[in-house]
Amino acid sequence: MTAENRGFCQLICHINVRIGWTIFGIVFGISAILTYAIKFHNWSATATTAIATLFACETLYLYWALKKNTIVNWKSSTFQLMIWPNVFIGLLGLLGCLVCYIIAGITHQGAGSIQGWSLFKCSIYFSKFAAMYGENLWFTGSWSLVITKWTWQNAFFARKYLNKIGTASEDGDIDDDDVEVIKS
């Protein structure tokens, strides 16, 4: 790895950047929850989005503990308890995504439709995005995939720090290149 690539990775992988992207994901998730519930009345997508946003909050908690360096006080059982439930829920999210996409395709659900739009008569017979209202499994499936993203990210994170704790017990020190410890 060249020095230029290393510098770019340190910028992109810096803990503050990770926290920023996670907060963006949480805000986006909350806005999607409100949109699916209030405007589209798509309750399966609302529930799936809420679950994904909760796992994004778990990611924020992990990153915040890493930034504040309190993660070094966690027991290895804490990390072990995080790995398998996150992997299992991620698999359920992936399975849910596939099932939703298959059912949505078989039942000919659309993610957005321009049927009913008439430019010549200057009128709209149906809403331009009529397929987005009510239950739509394309959105539910997409947010199921987001659940997989957050849960597997949390599982890999927990596994990484479980391994660091294991090597730290042998070496006597935990060293993380991604975090600056700020002493007051």
UniProtKB/Swiss-Prot annotation:
Presence of the UniProt keyword Transmembrane helix in the record: yes
PANTHER family per UniProt: HEME TRANSPORTER HRG-4, HEME TRANSPORTER HRG1
Disruption phenotype: RNAi-mediated knockdown results in the heme accumulation in the intestine under low heme conditions. Simultaneous RNAi-mediated knockdown with hrg-7 results in defective heme deficiency sensing.
Protein role: Heme transporter that mediates heme uptake across the plasma membrane.
UniProt record similarity statement: Belongs to the HRG family.
GO BP terms, alphabetized: heme transport
Transmembrane segments: 19-39, 46-66, 87-107, 124-146
Compartments reported by the entry: Cell membrane
Name of the featured protein: Heme transporter hrg-4
Cellular component, GO annotation: lysosomal membrane; plasma membrane
Glycosylation site residues: 42
UniProt keyword annotations, A-Z: Cell membrane, Glycoprotein, Membrane, Transmembrane, Transmembrane helix, Transport
Induction, per UniProt: By heme deficiency.
Gene name of this polypeptide: hrg-4
One of the record's GO molecular function terms: heme transmembrane transporter activity
Membrane topology: Multi-pass membrane protein
Pfam families with a match to the protein in the record: HRG (PF16954)
InterPro entries per the UniProt record, alphabetical: HRG
